[in-house]
Amino acid sequence: MLALISILLLFYISQNNLITLLIAIEILLLTVTVKLIYMGSVYDDIYGTIFSIVIIILAGAESAIGLSILVSYYRLRGKVGHTI
């Protein structure tokens, strides 16, 4: 799990396209969510499941807002990229 998070963080830092950065952030959130669900089932705790549902809802809202901002940016500039 830690290796996946590390690889995704490196992918997040090294990319030049904002859409792939949003995808990397979504995969990171889903990795944390899967870990919460697993730990909730191991320790028989309902709070991990409830918190993971909240994370999924927030990730969906973040995706919608991020993609709408990217579409607006693309219409304004004609390209979608960033510099670090």
UniProtKB/Swiss-Prot annotation:
What broad class describes the main subcellular location of this protein? Answer: mitochondrion
Q: Which residues cross the membrane?
A: 7-29, 50-70
Q: One GO cellular component from the entry? A: mitochondrial membrane
Q: Name one Pfam family in it.
A: Oxidored_q2
Superkingdom to which the source organism belongs: Eukaryota
Q: What is its EC number?
A: 7.1.1.2
**Protein's UniProt keywords contain Transit peptide:** no
Checking Gene3D superfamilies in the record gives: 1.10.287.3510
Mention one GO molecular function.
NADH dehydrogenase (ubiquinone) activity
Which UniProt keywords are present, listed alphabetically?
A: Electron transport, Membrane, Mitochondrion, NAD, Respiratory chain, Translocase, Transmembrane, Transmembrane helix, Transport, Ubiquinone
Q: Which reaction does it catalyse?
A: a ubiquinone + NADH + 5 H(+)(in) = a ubiquinol + NAD(+) + 4 H(+)(out)
Q: Which GO terms describe its biological process?
A: ATP synthesis coupled electron transport
Keyword Lipoprotein tagged: no
The protein's job, in short, is: Core subunit of the mitochondrial membrane respiratory chain NADH dehydrogenase (Complex I) that is believed to belong to the minimal assembly required for catalysis. Complex I functions in the transfer of electrons from NADH to the respiratory chain. The immediate electron acceptor for the enzyme is believed to be ubiquinone.
Name of the protein this chain belongs to? NADH-ubiquinone oxidoreductase chain 4L
